[in-house]
């Protein structure tokens, strides 16, 4: 038995897919399990890698991976055995969720610009920031309904972290409470 963690599950027909990571010596390895059978996706030789979210569309399996390279954390997507880098490799980036709608693939997370983490959405590999970058923020989940794309996350303004909802790129602030969002 090895240390590891599962972070996402997807059921397609009678197949159960999970993703996460498993420790392999000095490094963590991103893995995909289909009905309990593991496939190594990335990592394990010179870097750590983690599977964060997955989706299945027809026969295509997609996994969002974060690879902790020696200098920066990089967002990648694994599709049927092929790994593609989504984020700028010259800065830190994180991704937490994926959604598929038709032939469109959406991934959300954040990317560091200077010293600020800016919420970001990637559609078919093309990234778009969701805020101006004036404040730290994250995008945690994406959902597509028809032609509408919904993203939830947070943005820190001063000492308060606000819950945010974006619909088709338009930001809304959820009703304010007395405490920080979580």
Stretch-by-stretch model annotation:
Residues 1-182:
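Residue-level hotspots at or immediately adjacent to binding/recognition sites across diverse folds
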């Amino acid at each position: 038995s090895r240390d590891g963690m599962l972070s996402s599950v997807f059921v397609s027909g009678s197949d159960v897919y999970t993703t996460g990571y498993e420790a392999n010596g000095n490094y963590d390895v991103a893995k995909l399990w289909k009905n309990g059978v593991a496939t190594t996706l990335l990592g394990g030789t010179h870097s750590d890698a983690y599977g964060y979210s997955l989706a299945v569309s027809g026969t295509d399996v997609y996994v969002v991976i974060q690879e902790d390279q020696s200098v920066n954390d990089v967002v990648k997507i694994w599709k049927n055995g092929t790994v593609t880098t989504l984020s700028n490799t010259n800065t830190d980036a994180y991704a937490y969720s994926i959604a598929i709608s038709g032939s469109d693939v959406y991934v959300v997370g954040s990317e560091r610009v200077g010293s600020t983490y800016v919420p970001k959405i990637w559609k078919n590999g093309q990234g778009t920031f969701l805020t101006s970058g004036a404040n730290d923020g994250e995008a945690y989940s994406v959902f597509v309904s028809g032609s509408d794309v919904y993203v939830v996350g947070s943005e820190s303004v001063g000492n308060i972290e606000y819950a945010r909802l974006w619909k088709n790129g338009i930001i809304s602030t959820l009703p304010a409470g007395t405490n920080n969002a979580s």
